[in-house]
Amino acid sequence: MYLVAFMLLAILPTGYCQLNTLAVRAGKKYFGTATDNPELGDAPYVAQLGNTADFNQITAGNSMKWDATEPSRGTFTFSNGDTVANMARNRGQLLRGHTCVWHSQLPNWVTSGNFDNSTLLSIVQNHCSTLVSHYRGQMYSWDVVNEPFNEDGSFRQSVFFQKTGTAYIATALRAARNADPNTKLYINDFNIEGTGAKSTGMINLVRSLQQQNVPIDGIGVQAHLIVGQIPSSIQQNLQNFANLGVEVAITELDIRMTLPVTQQKLEQQQEDYRTVIRACKAVSRCVGVTVWDWTDRYSWVPGVFNGEGAACPWDENLAKKPAYQGIVDGWSQ
């Protein structure tokens, strides 16, 4: 049966294939998307979200973060995360956990607790262990540590770093490994698409963790990008990460533009999506690409970047934009 399926995939013309189908044909594990609980009441959206020919991997955008899962110390709630996980599992889609430790979307008890070093490390250990254990056996990968760097490659002065230095990173990774030995453990960050100080900081961190025998399986490259400004070194930088012996994944891809939308901007966006996909395709250890939701209807961009938007491959009416064809071309050319 599997041989027949593979042969059919091999002979299908590109025009009949969809994004995940083409990613698998290119040797990748998946093409996927983030989603979030509020949009799961939108039936047309949910129908396309479950189209595994386009999306065979799902990331919960917010419902597995610290404020959603441990709102008060030692009290865990997983209901919204379970909704996303169960939906994906029922459809046979891979799951990416997001995220164990992040400086943002923390409950007040973490940010204002004024814990000492050992207490805060114990809190990190317990949170990561409990969260990852709850989803043991369900996740392909976890963003264990999210956005630990400043733009210059130094470590972000988060509540965790201020009290523990980099010790919280190793603590989180070890807790996650013990909680689920078979999930892939990632460090995830933005503005590490091209070479530069921040990417060098990531490389140095991963090397240091490896030298300390701290488990680290992958680097997540968020790829929140701008139309016409894709780093020319993106493929080389993905390869630099891969040369560390870890997986690489593009984890939160969107490519925003200054509004209003024009045909010229849409065509440039199509080319930019193609460029990003081709970079992943060219790097054997780049295992897949996830868009940060697939439709402009639910994009985070307009709420954060004033006057910008239209970042996703589908528009607000759930119609494919030229960017969709850019992804198709990136996998198939």
UniProtKB/Swiss-Prot annotation:
Places the protein is found: Secreted
Enzyme Commission number(s) from the entry: 3.2.1.8
Pfam families: Glyco_hydro_10
Signal peptide limits: 1-17
The reaction(s) this protein catalyses: Endohydrolysis of (1->4)-beta-D-xylosidic linkages in xylans
Up-regulation conditions: Repressed on glucose.
InterPro entries reported for this sequence: GH10, GH10_AS, GH10_dom, Glycoside_hydrolase_SF
Top-level taxon of the source organism: Eukaryota
Key words, A-Z: Carbohydrate metabolism, Glycosidase, Hydrolase, Polysaccharide degradation, Secreted, Signal, Xylan degradation
GO MF, any single term: endo-1,4-beta-xylanase activity
Cellular compartments per GO CC: extracellular region
Active site per database record: 147 (proton donor), 252 (nucleophile)
Domain GH10: 18-330
UniProt family annotation: Belongs to the glycosyl hydrolase 10 (cellulase F) family.
Name of the protein in its database record: Endo-1,4-beta-xylanase
Organism: Agaricus bisporus
